[in-house]
Regions:
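An N-terminal assembly and electron-transfer interface module characteristic of large anaerobic redox
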Residues: 1-225
Length: 225
């Protein structure tokens, strides 16, 4: 690690501390990038390639990835346009995700909440988020319920702790950690996210979530219809 020419930091919290220490001890430069979303991933590749003076190779890679994955992304974007999403993740991932899903998928981020966010995370969230978006720091369950009632999201991008909670409200969630169906990084990964968001929002079983199966009359009526 100490022989590297460059440290590329994606998670600005844990790996950032390591990169700062390596810069202090060994003089290795630190470069921060985002790897979620097509626009941010392309920007990150350009930064890395510019550092090493291989811009042409970077542009060729970006062109190949766009040709391979952009048509699939556009298919999902057309069907997710205007979807209302709440993002409840760790501090750094808030500002990684909010603009990428809005710009690359046409999703409207209506609320955000962070765990373990630092001041710099808040500043980036404010800079990237749109005016009128609600932001909660270290929200509890009661605050989550209140904000859900207020903004009425179609889907929530979060972890299992909050995700399993909101399922009781019949609201789908996408596991932001990506270990169910991910990864969500890079061009292919962002298509995975688009796919999972589409499947969550357009799942035909959503309409059945609120039916009380103990009400036999309601079930019979549904079957007759």
């Amino acid at each position: 690690m100490h022989q590297a020419k460059l440290n590329v930091v994606n998670c600005a919290r844990s790996s950032g501390y390591i990169a700062n220490e390596l810069k202090k001890r060994y003089g290795i430069p630190r470069l921060d990038i985002d790897s979620w979303g097509f626009s941010y991933m392309a920007e990150g590749i350009r930064k890395i390639c510019a550092f090493f003076g291989i811009e042409d190779r970077g542009e060729a890679l970006i062109a190949d990835e766009y040709a391979k994955w952009k048509p699939q992304l556009d298919w999902y974007k057309e069907r997710l346009q205007g979807t209302r999403m709440a993002i409840w993740t760790g501090g750094p991932r808030l500002w990684h995700w909010t603009k990428s899903v809005e710009d690359d998928l046409g999703i409207q981020v209506v609320a955000m909440s962070s765990k373990f966010g630092h001041e710099e995370d808040f500043e980036k969230v404010i800079a990237r988020g749109k005016e009128g978006t609600y932001y909660i720091d270290d929200g509890n369950e009661l605050e989550f319920f209140e904000i859900i009632e207020l903004v009425k999201p179609d889907v929530i991008f979060t972890g299992p702790r909050v995700g399993e909670l909101v399922k009781k409200l019949h609201i789908p969630y996408v596991n932001g950690h990506g270990y169910h169906n991910g990864p969500y990084m890079s061009f292919e990964g962002f298509v995975n996210l688009a796919r999972d968001t589409y499947n969550a929002v357009h799942n035909p079983l959503r309409g059945l979530a609120g039916i009380d199966i103990r009400d036999k009359g309601q079930v019979q009526l549904k079957e007759a219809a």
